[in-house]
Each structure stands twice: as C-alpha cells, then as structure tokens.
Amino acid sequence: MDDPKNAESLLAIWKSYDNGNVSAAKDLFADTISAELGDGMIVRSSRDSMLAQVQAVRNSFKSAIDQVDAVMAVKSTDRNEHWVLIWGTETDTYKSGKVDSTHLQETWRFNKNGKADLVFQYKRPGTPPMRSK
C-alpha cells in the first residue's frame, strides 16, 4: 500500500470530469502526461493540451457520472514508483439524450511531486440501462 493522498487526487480528477470542469484538477497533473486509452489511442502531450482534449470529449456529453467501485494506492518497491488503481463505471448522457455506460479500470502513476504523469485505461461497454415499463 502507499500514501492515500494520491488516491484522493485521482478521485478529485474523476470528480472534475463528472462536474464538466477538468481544468479544476489541473494542478494534479505533471507538465507532460502519457496515456494509453481504452480505445487503443496512445497520447503523450503537455498537460494543457491533454486537458483540452479531455474537456472536448466531456463537452460532447450532457452529463457524465462515475461510480467508483474501488480505488487503492500502491507502491512499486522495485522502481520506487507511486501508482493508483481505480475501478468504476462511467454513465454518459449525450446531448441527444442517449445514455451509454462503460466499465473502467485505470492505472495511474504519480511522480515524486504527487502529480499524475501516466495512465493506462482499460474499458468495456456497460450493460445498457433497463428500459422503464
């Protein structure tokens, strides 16, 4: 296990996405971020560029709600690295009214300054919401 402050930072990052204001978590990211996303995209860019891209995705939704199932901070003792693992389900409502959900598992690395600098994302489609009768 590792210092829970990094897990708290990751929860704040997820919350800023839900709230539609990813820049609120800007100070939790390193100057350069690498990401391997669940759709196969690999990105390495500046913090501001990455956050602008994420904000553009978030802006395509009317709402986004993340339900966290588990989060834990761990330390890689052989590399002296700090990681946070998170599992959850994201339910997005498009501006058209369509609702979609995705099950997520993300592995985030935090540098020695407590800033996120790397994320691996794994995802699969969620079960469609039950239709009301």
Regions found by a protein language model. Give the residues of each.
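Hydrophobic pocket/interface hotspot
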Residues: 13, 24-26, 33, 50, ...
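Short, low-complexity N-terminal intrinsically disordered segments enriched in polar/charged residues
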Residues: 1-19, 23
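A solvent-exposed, acidic/Ser-Thr-rich amphipathic alpha-helical stretch
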Residues: 22-74
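Exposed beta-sheet edge and beta->alpha loop/turn motif
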Residues: 85-115
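Low-complexity, intrinsically disordered terminal/linker segments enriched in charged
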Residues: 118-133
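Short beta-strand segments enriched in hydrophobic/aromatic residues
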Residues: 29, 88-92, 123
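A short, glycine/Asx- and small/polar-enriched loop/turn
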Residues: 78-83
